[in-house]
Amino acid sequence: MRPSGRSAQQVRPVTLTRHYTKHAEGSVLVEFGDTKVLCTATIEEGVPRFLKGKGQGWVTAEYGMLPRATHSRNAREAAKGKQGGRTLEIQRLIARSLRAAIDLKVLGEFTITLDCDVLQADGGTRTASITGACVALADALNHLVSTGKLKANPMKGMVAAISVGIVNGEALCDLEYVEDAAAETDMNVVMTEDGRMIEVQGTAEGEPFSHEELLKLLELARGGIDTLVAAQKAALTD
C-alpha cells in the first residue's frame, strides 16, 4: 500500500491554475499532490548572441526552490553566491524539454524564459516544473499570436514529465518524497503528447534494474504522461 493509498499506476491529483500572476505573458501554478511550483513565461525580443541573424528563437529556463519548500530551511542560492549542480541540471532539463515542444524557426527572434519556482516540495519538482511550464509557454505563444507579433503559432504539441521508480520491488508512477527516498530505482521521463521520448533519466540507487523492469517503468510513465497531457489540454480550454 502506498502512503497516499494510490494504485501503482495512479498519479497524484493534478491541478494547473493559469494566469496565476498578472505580469507574465504566461503563468501557471502546477500542483502534483503536495508539490507546488509556480511557472512563469517571459517574452523578450532578441536572441542569444550565438543565434543572432539565424532567424530562429530560443527557449531557456531557470529553476529554484523557496528556502522553506522542504522540511527544513535551505539557504537561498543567491546568498551562497552561486547555483548548485542540481539546480543547473534541472533548469537545463526544463529548457531542453520545452524546446522540443515548439518550432524555433516559427518563433522568430524572440526569447522565452520559463521561471520555475518551487513553493512546496514533496517529490517530482522537476517533472511538475516541465508539465506546468509547458502550459505557461503555450499561453505566452498565444499572446504573441494574439498581439500580431507572430502570424503562426510555433507550438507543435504538449510536453509533460513524470517520475517512476521501483520501491520495495514494485514499479510505481509519480513518486512522492517518502517513496523517492526509499526507491531502489528512480527515473524521470519526459515525453511529447504522442508518446515520443525527449529525455529518460534513470538511476539504480540500490539493486540494478532489469530490461523488463525498464520497460515496465516506461509503460507506467506513458500512462502517467497521458493523464498529464489530458490535464494540460483541459486547463488550456478553460
Curated annotation (Swiss-Prot):
PROSITE patterns: RIBONUCLEASE_PH. GO terms for molecular function: 3'-5'-RNA exonuclease activity; tRNA binding; tRNA nucleotidyltransferase activity. InterPro entries: ExoRNase_PH_dom1, ExoRNase_PH_dom2, ExoRNase_PH_dom2_sf, PNPase/RNase_PH_dom_sf, Ribosomal_Su5_D2-typ_SF, RNase_PH, RNase_PH_bac-type, RNase_PH_CS. It holds the Pfam family RNase_PH_C. The keyword Cell cycle does not apply. It is an enzyme of class 2 (transferase). Transmembrane segments: none annotated. Phosphate binds at residues 86, 124-126. HAMAP family: RNase_PH. Homohexameric ring arranged as a trimer of dimers. Belongs to the RNase PH family. Phosphorolytic 3'-5' exoribonuclease that plays an important role in tRNA 3'-end maturation. Removes nucleotide residues following the 3'-CCA terminus of tRNAs; can also add nucleotides to the ends of RNA molecules by using nucleoside diphosphates as substrates, but this may not be physiologically important. Probably plays a role in initiation of 16S rRNA degradation (leading to ribosome degradation) during starvation. This is Ribonuclease PH. It comes from Erwinia tasmaniensis (strain DSM 17950 / CFBP 7177 / CIP 109463 / NCPPB 4357 / Et1/99).
